[in-house]
Swiss-Prot record:
Belongs to the RbfA family. This is Ribosome-binding factor A. The gene is rbfA. Monomer. Binds 30S ribosomal subunits, but not 50S ribosomal subunits or 70S ribosomes. GO terms for biological process: maturation of SSU-rRNA. Keywords: Cytoplasm, Ribosome biogenesis. One of its GO terms (molecular function) is ribosomal small subunit binding. One of several proteins that assist in the late maturation steps of the functional core of the 30S ribosomal subunit. Associates with free 30S ribosomal subunits (but not with 30S subunits that are part of 70S ribosomes or polysomes). Required for efficient processing of 16S rRNA. May interact with the 5'-terminal helix region of 16S rRNA. NCBIfam families: rbfA. It comes from the Bacteria. It comes from Tropheryma whipplei (strain Twist). InterPro entries: KH_dom-like_a/b, RbfA, RbfA_dom_sf. One of its GO terms (cellular component) is cytosol.
Length: 196
């Protein structure tokens, strides 16, 4: 059993090391050859499968949603060039590359806004003022939950010890976002799906 764990650990270490090398090579390629077409693009994370055959590159684009979609299309159109540039890795199989917009910062902004509203509500409650429920915050939370609920397999529920059921929290361990709803924490960690 120890050999199995040791082998799995080595795969994770190799994948992590490969992800760093891929991130470096792709960012250099973007900087030297596609800078004028893309604008400000940042690689936030690279995930590589254990067999090193596939890499998913998460990017953020400074600008509007249309500019982000255009940049993503340019990156996707240049996948073959990126894969060719990864040939310097000297591995048996050069990994395929897939690009995806990283929504972590967008979701974090929404969560920050919700946290701020929850704090303001807590201050009103602590001061003894009772007011209407913040329908905007509720609608915003529903929007976040609806967007993330489209992939129900990636949600994990866990009870929370908090007695305050209206509170919200943003957890930044391995990039999960958590929301405290009715004493249950819904966490969606960014983990590879079945294909990755």
């Amino acid at each position: 059993m120890d050999r199995v764990k040791e082998f799995a650990m080595k795969d994770q270490i190799r994948a992590h090391r490969m992800a760093g090398r891929i991130r470096h090579l792709i960012s250099r390629q973007i900087e030297t050859k596609l800078r004028d077409q893309l604008g400000l693009v940042t690689i936030t994370e690279v995930q590589v499968t254990g067999d090193l055959h596939h890499a998913k590159v998460f990017v953020t684009v400074y600008g509007t949603k249309d500019e982000a979609q255009t940049a993503l299309k340019i990156l996707e159109d240049n996948r073959a060039n990126f894969r060719r540039s990864l040939g310097v890795l000297k591995v048996r199989f050069v990994p395929t590359v897939e690009f995806e917009l990283d929504r972590l910062f967008e979701d974090a902004g929404i969560m920050d806004e919700l946290i701020q509203r929850a704090r303001e509500s807590d201050k009103r409650i602590a001061a003894g003022a009772s007011g209407p429920i913040d329908n905007d915050a509720t609608a915003l939370m529903d929007k976040v939950v609806d967007q993330e609920a489209r992939n129900p397999d990636s949600w994990h529920t866990a009870p929370t010890s908090s007695s305050h059921t209206a509170g919200l929290c943003l957890v930044r361990a391995s990039s999960p976002i958590a929301c405290n709803i009715d004493s249950t924490t819904l966490c969606k960690p960014r983990t590879p799906g079945p294909g990755l």
